[in-house]
Regions:
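N-terminal glycine-rich phosphate-binding loop and ensuing alpha1 helix
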Residues: 6-59
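Conserved N-terminal catalytic core of the sugar/cofactor nucleotidyltransferase
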Residues: 2, 38-102
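Short aromatic-hydrophobic micro-motifs that form the base-stacking/packing surface
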Residues: 104-108
């Protein structure tokens, strides 16, 4: 029996954007009327090539639940880390129970 290869995406989004100076994390800054993170997630979800997404978020993120994509069953979230590589590691750990050894993982 051959298992279908699934494709997952990890989106590190735990940054605070303090250098960006917008008053909120840059992933939530509106671009053409939508938060940047919403554009990213909707683009990944629109294609047939991504089976699921894990978004690594800062503890206490107050903006996540406002995104429509946060309620899509293909999208889950995990705690982000203090640095990008820690957020990616947490995303991989969050996939551990669902992804198989032959699956692919895209890191945005």
């Amino acid at each position: 029996m051959t298992l279908a290869v699934r494709r997952w995406a990890i989106v590190p989004a735990a940054g605070q954007g303090s250098r960006f100076g917008a008053g909120l994390p840059k992933q939530y800054v509106a671009v053409l009327g939508r938060p940047l993170l919403s554009w990213t997630l909707s683009s990944l979800l629109a294609g047939p090539r991504v089976d699921g997404i894990v978004v690594a978020l800062a503890p206490g993120d107050r903006h996540w639940r406002d995104l429509p994509e946060a309620h899509d069953p293909r999208v889950r979230h995990c705690a982000g880390g203090a640095r990008r590589e820690l957020s990616v590691a947490n995303g991989l750990e969050a996939l551990a129970g669902n992804a198989s050894d032959t699956d692919w993982v895209l890191v945005h």
